[in-house]
From Swiss-Prot:
GO cellular component, one term: membrane
GO molecular function: heme binding; iron ion binding; monooxygenase activity; oxidoreductase activity, acting on paired donors, with incorporation or reduction of molecular oxygen
Organism: Aspergillus fumigatus (strain ATCC MYA-4609 / CBS 101355 / FGSC A1100 / Af293)
Gene3D superfamilies recorded: Cytochrome P450
EC number, UniProt record: 1.-.-.-
Protein name, UniProt field: Cytochrome P450 monooxygenase helB1
Cofactor(s) of this protein: heme
Keywords, alphabetical: Glycoprotein, Heme, Iron, Membrane, Metal-binding, Monooxygenase, Oxidoreductase, Transmembrane, Transmembrane helix
SUPFAM superfamilies tied to this protein: Cytochrome P450
Binding residues annotated for heme, in chain numbering: C497
GO BP of this protein: helvolic acid biosynthetic process; secondary metabolic process
C-alpha cells in the first residue's frame, strides 16, 4: 500500500495566487491559524495551542461582560438612534409633543388599551397645543378647523388601523379605505338610512326598543309591589339596542332584554374594546394567549353562521312569497344596488355589513342613551324641565315617535344633542393618512405619509365654539341649527357615520318615552350626583373608559337608578341632595 505525506513546504491550498501581504496577514491571523490546523495536522497541535493562549489573554475581559451589559449597550444604541432621529432627522421634529411620543409608539398604545386616551390627550393639548406629536411618525389634531380640513378631504384616507374591522377578508362600510369603493358602498346602503325608509321601519324599532324596556321595567315594579325599583340603565339600554340591531340586521331577535343578558352582546362589548389596539390583537393570536380569544372566535363563528342563515332564510321566504318584502335592514342590504354602477352586494358583503352594523351600531347608540340619562340625573333642574315638556305634550298612554319629538319636544331633543356634545360616545382618536399630499395645520407642515389622529371629542369642548363647555346646558341647541352642525359625534365629511339617522330614531324615542312614563332618580348610595361637585362647582361625571366608544368604567356601580311608574295626574317629585 502506497502512503502519502503532506509536504511542509507550503501551507497554501491550490488556488489563485494571492499577493504576499494578503498571504502573510491570513497566515498570521487566528482564523488563518485554525484553518491551517485543520489542513495540517502535524502543525495543528502547535497552532491550536497558540490560539488558545491568545484567547486566554482576553478571558478576564470577557468575564466582565454580562448579558445585562450587552442588553444595556443595545438599548443605549437604539435610544441614541431614536433621539437623533426625533430631534434631527424626523420631518415632525419642529412640532411640539412629549419626548416619549417622539421615541416610541408604546405611550399611545398603553393609553389606548387602558381606555385613558381621552384624559391623556386633554393633558397633552393643554401643554402642547392643538397639533402635537402623538407617535414617532404621527400627529394628533384637535382644532375644529383642522379636523374639518382633514375629514372633509378624500385625500386623507382611513389608515391601516381600520383593517381590524374587516370580516375576515371582506371589508365593510367602516373599514373600506379606498374612496371609490367606500362611495359605492354608501350609495348601496344609503337608501335604508334615510328618514323616509326608517319611518316605515319605526314600529319594529319601537317594539324592540322602548316597548321592550317598558315591559321589563313594569314587570320589575310589579314584582316589587309597585314600590320604587332599581334598574341599571346602561345594561338595559345596551340590551334593547342590541335587540333592535339584530332584528333589523338579521330579521331575527335575540330577545336579550327579556332574558336579561346576552353572551353575544357581552363578547361584542369586549371585542369593541380589543379592536382599539391592533398590537394586543396580534398578541392574542399567539399561544397561549390565543386561548383567551377562543370563546370570542366561537361566538363570532356562530354569529357569522347566524347571519348567513338569516340571508338564506330571507331568500327562501321571498322565493315562496315575494308579494311583500319585510321592512328591515337585512332586506335593504339584499336589495341594495349602486345606482351608478348597478352593482349589488355579494352574500359575504351583506353578512359583513350586517355584523358590523349590529356590533358597532348597538354599542355606540346605547352609550349615547346612557350618557343622556346620567347627565339628566346629575342636573335635576334640567331633568325636571325635560319631564315637564314631554308630559305636557303627550298623555300617559301615548307612544312617542321620532316625528313627535322633532315636532313637539325641542327641549328633550336639545338634551340629547347636549349629551352628545358633552360626553360624545365616539370620543376616541380616528387615524387618517395621505401618501401623496401634505397639509399645514396651525402653522406646522404635516408631510405625506404621516398618520393624523383626529380627536373627535375636542371640537365638542373647544372654547372657540362653546361658552363654558364643561357645563351641561341643553339651551345651546334650542333654535340653533348652526350649533347642531358643529357636532362631530357622527364624524364629518364624506366618511361620516352612515347610521346616524337610525341612531337618532332610537335615542329620541327611548329617552322621550322613559321620561314620559317613569320618574327617575339616583340611588341613595350613588357616588356621583348633583351633590358631588368639582372645583368649578359642576357635578363630577362617573369615570369612563374610551375605546372605540366611551363606556362607563364601572357600570354595575355607577349606572343604577330608581324608577317609579308614573300614575295619571301625579307629578314627579324631586329628591333633595346634600353636599358630599
Amino acid at each position: 500500500m502506497r502512503t502519502y505525506a503532506i509536504r511542509p513546504v507550503s501551507n497554501r491550498l491550490p488556488g489563485p495566487i494571492e499577493p504576499k501581504k494578503h498571504r502573510r496577514d491570513r497566515d498570521n491571523s487566528t482564523t488563518g491559524s485554525l484553518y491551517n490546523a485543520l489542513i495540517h495536522p502535524v502543525q495543528g497541535e502547535k497552532t491550536i495551542t497558540s490560539t488558545m493562549i491568545r484567547v486566554a489573554e482576553f478571558q478576564p475581559f470577557l468575564n466582565t461582560i454580562s448579558v445585562l451589559q450587552v442588553l444595556a449597550a443595545i438599548f443605549i444604541g437604539a435610544l441614541t438612534y431614536r433621539l437623533i432621529d426625533a430631534f434631527f432627522l424626523s420631518p415632525l421634529r419642529s412640532i411640539p409633543g412629549p419626548l416619549l411620543a417622539r421615541l416610541t409608539t408604546k405611550r399611545a398604545n398603553v393609553d389606548t388599551f387602558s381606555g385613558k386616551v381621552t384624559q391623556t390627550v386633554d393633558k397633552d393639548v393643554a401643554r402642547y397645543g392643538d397639533v402635537y406629536v402623538y407617535k414617532p411618525r404621527a400627529v394628533c389634531i384637535n382644532h375644529p378647523d383642522d379636523i374639518r380640513a382633514v375629514l372633509g378631504s378624500q385625500e386623507f384616507r382611513k389608515a391601516a388601523f381600520f383593517d381590524i374591522f374587516n370580516d375576515g377578508n371582506t371589508p365593510n362600510i367602516v373599514s373600506l379605505r379606498e374612496p371609490e369603493l367606500a362611495n359605492r358602498r354608501r350609495r348601496q346602503l344609503g337608501p335604508f338610512f334615510n328618514y323616509a325608509y326608517l319611518g316605515r321601519a319605526e314600529p319594529l324599532i319601537l317594539q324592540h326598543g322602548y316597548q321592550a324596556i317598558r315591559t321589563k321595567w313594569d314587570a320589575l315594579i310589579q314584582a316589587n309591589s309597585g314600590r320604587p325599583t332599581e334598574v341599571n340603565y346602561r345594561t338595559d339600554t345596551q340590551l334593547v339596542t342590541f335587540d333592535i340591531m339584530s332584528a333589523l340586521a338579521f330579521g331575527r331577535n335575540f330577545n336579550a332584554i327579556s332574558r336579561g343578558s346576552s353572551s353575544i352582546m357581552k363578547w361584542a362589548g369586549l371585542i369593541m374594546e380589543m379592536l382599539e389596539s391592533p398590537a394586543v390583537l396580534a398578541l392574542l393570536s399567539l399561544l397561549p394567549f390565543s386561548l383567551i380569544m377562543r370563546p370570542w372566535k366561537i361566538m363570532y363563528r356562530e354569529l357569522a353562521a347566524f347571519s348567513s342563515d338569516a340571508v338564506d332564510m330571507r331568500k327562501q321566504l321571498l322565493a315562496e312569497d315575494s308579494t311583500e318584502k319585510p321592512l328591515d335592514m337585512l332586506q335593504a342590504f339584499i336589495d341594495a344596488e349602486d345606482p351608478e354602477s348597478k352593482i349589488k352586494m355579494s352574500p359575504h358583503e351583506v353578512q359583513a355589513e350586517s355584523i358590523m352594523m349590529m356590533l358597532a351600531g348597538s354599542e355606540t347608540t346605547s352609550s349615547a342613551i346612557m350618557w343622556t340619562f346620567h347627565l339628566l340625573l346629575l342636573y335635576p333642574e334640567t331633568l325636571r324641565r325635560a319631564v315637564h315638556e314631554v308630559r305636557s305634550a303627550f298623555s300617559l298612554n301615548h307612544l312617542v315617535t321620532y316625528k313627535d319629538v322633532r315636532s313637539s319636544l325641542p327641549y328633550v331633543e336639545a338634551c340629547v344633542y347636549e349629551a352628545l356634545r358633552h360626553s360624545p360616545t365616539t370620543a376616541g382618536l380616528t387615524p387618517r393618512i395621505s401618501h401623496s399630499t401634505g397639509i399645514t395645520l396651525q402653522g406646522y407642515y404635516i408631510p405625506p405619509g404621516t398618520e393624523i389622529y383626529v380627536n373627535l371629542r375636542s371640537p365638542s369642548m373647544h372654547p372657540s365654539l362653546w361658552d363654558d363647555p364643561a357645563r351641561f346646558n341643553p339651551d345651546r341647541f334650542l333654535d340653533s341649527d348652526n350649533n347642531k352642525r358643529l357636532l362631530f359625534t357622527f364624524s364629518y365629511g364624506p366618511r361620516n357615520c352612515l347610521g346616524r339617522n337610525l341612531a337618532w330614531v332610537e335615542m329620541l324615542t327611548i329617552v322621550a318615552n322613559v321620561l314620559k312614563d317613569y320618574d327617575i332618580a339616583l340611588t341613595e348610595d350613588s357616588l356621583f350626583g348633583p351633590h358631588c361637585t368639582d372645583e368649578n362647582g359642576l357635578p363630577v361625571l362617573m369615570p369612563a373608559k374610551c375605546f372605540i366608544a366611551s363606556f362607563p368604567a364601572k357600570p354595575e356601580r355607577d349606572c343604577r337608578m330608581v324608577i317609579t311608574r308614573r300614575m295619571a295626574g301625579v307629578k314627579a317629585c324631586a329628591r333633595e341632595y346634600s353636599p358630599c
